Amino acid sequence: MFTGIHFIPADTKIGFVRLRTISWVVSALLTIVPLLLVWKVGLNFGIDFQGGTLIEIQTKENVADLGDIRAKVHGLNLGEVQIQEFGAPNDVLIRIAAQPTEKEQQDSIAKVKQVLGDQVEYRRIEVVGPTISSELIAGGTVAVVVAMMAILMYIWFRFEWQFAVAAIASLVHDVTGTIGLYAALQLEFNLSSIAAILTIIGYSLNDKVVIFDRIRENLRKYKKMPLTELLDLSINETLSRTVLTHVTTFLAMMPFVLVGGEAIFGFALAMVWGIVIGAYSSIYVAAPLQLRAARCGGQQRRDRGPSRPGDRANARELCRCVRY
């Protein structure tokens, strides 16, 4: 009988948790380096968080003369102005710093239109005041924090505190790694970036819950198995699902990175990176942290061998940490 195509063998026995010492180092780098990048380099905040005016134009020539456009706009004395190519060679993005009043912001747009004339097509004009931008920063931060707290309560209620700690720590790892990508490549950090981070959190959490659920099932099934071996078994049993899910999503997002255009490039690239780092953290961060949390909580499994007198009691104690 045809049982389908198996891209990954069903009986893999990879010792993932045994490599936790190496994974600690890699995970520490993936957490610390992004924080250093944000501190030293900073994020390239978009108009959503910085405030100001954004004007996207398309010139009639095949290649825009950035020098001429820059000279005309800088001559208006509007404060800090950034002019850069955006996508096609004749697409140009003009960023103007926030003006003191809303009227002055509207006047700045009129002045730009006046100096550029009808030789360009105005494809997009966005204006965000300083008050709105500060509110968006606060709202975006609150959204991420609330999502993390809700996840903590959900995992704690469904499983136990050891699983909740492991899930939150690994998700923080994913978030800092993604923010580090924005800092390293100086991608525009805007509301789409917040949406990408929240999507990555949900996507990565789903994968971790699947593994945690298999760990809970195996805790009831193999009461004498050392915890390290049980975690490896659980990860291997869900490995096919983990890999195939991430690969298919990765392949679905790559066209947006390659040909999706500048408007969604940052979001798509963050999603691709989040898929990769989320798969890594589900295997090499969440499970080892669950092991460490269980041991720190005094709930050690029989890593010392099944013949110890207290083994059965330890098994019952650990199994009680998992709600049915």
Residue ranges and their predicted role:
Residues 1-324:
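A structural signal for conserved, well-ordered secondary-structure elements
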